[in-house]
């Protein structure tokens, strides 16, 4: 499997479907140019300003036209990659000085490296087993449920939790980077799939650690899939 940013996925990003997705581009060629421009603008901003901002929480209100980055949000899944891609752009609101969007694969990788560089996590916690800091099937920890009460997530249970509801899942003030919902990224897997990162609440932290890449078709939507947003200065 080859992983690439930016790129289209040919099995889904063809002209007849792009016309109906509301992505801005209506042909495969236009969409590829659009993705390349967005990627290049992000890289230019990082080079100029020295970095980017990653959402503290997984993207919430994701079934709305304008999502949010908000603690305690439970509306974090069950949308296709296409819907999340176009909606994450609206997080910036009326602010014309920044751009927001779904996180790129290289931004995800740089965030993981930053966690290691700052001593927040070890290489082993990133690459081998992320159970100790994520909402995985094999993890146990306390969290605040949607009713505002403290609850225990038991080992051997698959429990999706509200965003930012467990100190157990925090790393450098970023919550749920691993475990909870799988986070779609902008990265393409081969020529027909989109990549998601960070494991999931139904998975093992040893089998699906923070840096593990896996993929699905971008039209999939279920309780397991969400996304992480990022922001850069224009």
Name each model feature, range by range:
Residues 3-6, 13, 55-57, 187, ...:
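Structured loops at beta-to-helix junctions and adjacent beta-edge loops in soluble globular domains
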Residues 176-177, 224:
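Residue-level recognition of short, solvent-exposed, well-ordered loop/turn junctions
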Residues 3-176:
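Short aromatic-cysteine micro-motif
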Residues 1, 48-49, 220-225:
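Extracellular interaction modules
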Residues 61-63, 182-183, 191, 203-204:
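Eukaryotic short linear interaction motifs
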